[in-house]
């Protein structure tokens, strides 16, 4: 059974889209920027202020979901940790299951894993081996895409299970760092609600 926005929100897809476009400018303003965190020269984009404002959070989730309203989505996979918050809300909205993608050693059952590149070195992400069945349609979610290393690893991990990756969704894209372009080059559509310059 596939839910539609009308069933979830009590209004048509067009009405929701008009509403979110009307207040979309608020979303970027609701993200707090913290200079020199976690190190000098970095502008940290803090989405906890967006998540803490009910109107902004609702608008962000509605806007991220909009392209798949009425579509069959089997699972939403969220990257630890803020991807859990956003992904859980999206999974609820599209009436799908939710799959956590976690750092190595955090899941209790048998896992599949994938190594991915960091700025300096590498790390490993995992998910339960039985979390996704071959052919299931999956949306990948995280809060922000910068260099795209973690998202790239997550896509490879999902493909290892036979998932069909419908899209990768983010609240924020830092386009100068090239992550979204890298994901598109992997054949995965990218949806981001806003862009910020720099890193």
Curated annotation (Swiss-Prot):
Indicate the enzyme's highest-level EC class.
transferase
Q: Gene Ontology cellular component?
A: cytoplasm
Q: List localization entries.
A: Cytoplasm
- From which source organism is this entry? Rhodopseudomonas palustris (strain BisB18)
What are the GO MF terms of this UniProt record?
Answer: adenine binding; adenine phosphoribosyltransferase activity; AMP binding
| Keywords from the UniProt entry | Cytoplasm, Glycosyltransferase, Purine salvage, Transferase
Read off the lineage from the record: Bacteria, Pseudomonadati, Pseudomonadota, Alphaproteobacteria, Hyphomicrobiales
Q: Which InterPro entries match?
A: Ade_phspho_trans, PRibTrfase_dom, PRTase-like, UPRTase/APRTase
Give the residue spans that cross the bilayer: none
Q: Name one GO biological process term.
A: AMP salvage
Q: Report the family membership.
A: Belongs to the purine/pyrimidine phosphoribosyltransferase family.
What is its pathway? Purine metabolism; AMP biosynthesis via salvage pathway; AMP from adenine: step 1/1
According to its UniProt entry, the function of this protein is described as: Catalyzes a salvage reaction resulting in the formation of AMP, that is energically less costly than de novo synthesis.
Task: Cite the Pfam families for this sequence.
Answer: Pribosyltran (PF00156)
Q: What is this protein called?
A: Adenine phosphoribosyltransferase
């Amino acid at each position: 059974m596939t839910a539609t926005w009308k069933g979830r929100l009590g209004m048509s897809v067009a009405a929701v889209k008009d509403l979110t476009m009307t207040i979309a400018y608020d979303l970027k303003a609701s993200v707090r920027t913290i200079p020199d965190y976690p190190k000098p020269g970095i502008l940290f984009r803090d989405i906890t202020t967006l998540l803490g404002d009910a109107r902004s959070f609702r608008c962000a989730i509605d806007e991220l979901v909009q392209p798949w309203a009425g579509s069959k989505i089997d699972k939403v996979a969220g990257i630890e940790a803020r991807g859990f918050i956003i992904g859980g809300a999206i999974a609820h909205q599209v009436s799908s299951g939710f799959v956590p993608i976690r750092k190595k050693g955090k899941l209790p059952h048998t896992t599949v894993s994938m190594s991915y590149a960091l700025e300096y070195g590498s790390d490993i992400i995992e998910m339960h081996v039985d979390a996704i069945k071959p052919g299931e349609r999956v949306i990948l979610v995280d809060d922000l895409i910068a260099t795209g290393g973690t998202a790239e690893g997550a896509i490879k991990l999902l493909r290892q299970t036979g998932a069909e990756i419908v899209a990768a969704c983010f609240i924020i894209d830092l386009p100068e760092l090239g992550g979204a372009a890298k994901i598109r080059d992997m054949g995965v559509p990218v949806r981001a609600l806003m862009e910020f310059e720099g890193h």
